């Protein structure tokens, strides 16, 4: 992993491996050097109070998060909310407050950014609230929320989308001090 990739970790939670959210994430990864994790390629089980799911991939991702200075969560907007993959992933952060407090504490002061991608220009009010409150609870810095959209996975097929994604890239670079 390069120094930039260690600084930025981009985590994608989408049902479509070749979807619009993945397209935005790949564009940003290419432009910023961010490491990219696609939750659809991993096995991450639901949170359970008995912690029977410790053999899945969640803790590997959690360790990578502790190595990053900036964590970017990218999710499509499904039914006015984050994807099921992203919600399951966030629910598992509860493990970082119980059985792996050592990892959870290492997230303090890291920057957390949310990217959403949908088929309209703005998602509903309050879309970012769960991520903002998660950042607060984990003592992380919520560093921004950006929404964009794509048509047929073409970042530059639409002038408005191009402007939005370029603004997002510039904002991410500003957040990481590039």
Regions found by a protein language model. Give the residues of each.
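Short, glycine/serine-rich, charged loops/turns that create anion-binding
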Residues: 15-16, 119-120, 150
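Short glycine-rich catalytic loops that host catalytic nucleophiles or stabilize transition states
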Residues: 38-41, 146-150
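Short, glycine-/small-residue-rich phosphate/pyrophosphate-handling segment
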Residues: 106-145
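Short, charged/polar "capping" segments at the starts of alpha-helices
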Residues: 123-124, 153-156
């Amino acid at each position: 992993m390069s120094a930039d990739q260690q600084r930025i970790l981009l985590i994608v939670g989408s049902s479509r491996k070749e979807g619009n959210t993945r397209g935005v994430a790949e564009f940003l990864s290419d432009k910023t050097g961010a490491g990219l994790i696609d939750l659809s390629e991993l096995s991450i089980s639901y949170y359970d109070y008995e912690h029977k799911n410790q053999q899945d991939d969640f803790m590997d991702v959690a360790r990578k998060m502790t190595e990053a200075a900036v964590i970017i969560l990218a999710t499509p907007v499904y039914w006015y909310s984050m994807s099921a993959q992203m919600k399951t992933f966030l629910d598992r952060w509860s493990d970082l407050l119980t059985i792996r407090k050592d990892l959870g504490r290492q997230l303090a002061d890291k920057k957390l950014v949310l990217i959403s991608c949908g088929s309209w220009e703005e998602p509903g009010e309050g879309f970012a609230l769960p991520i903002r409150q998660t950042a607060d609870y984990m003592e992380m810095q919520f560093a921004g929320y950006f929404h964009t959209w794509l048509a047929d996975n073409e970042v530059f097929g639409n002038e408005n989308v191009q402007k939005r994604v370029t603004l997002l890239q510039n904002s991410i670079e500003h957040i990481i001090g590039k």
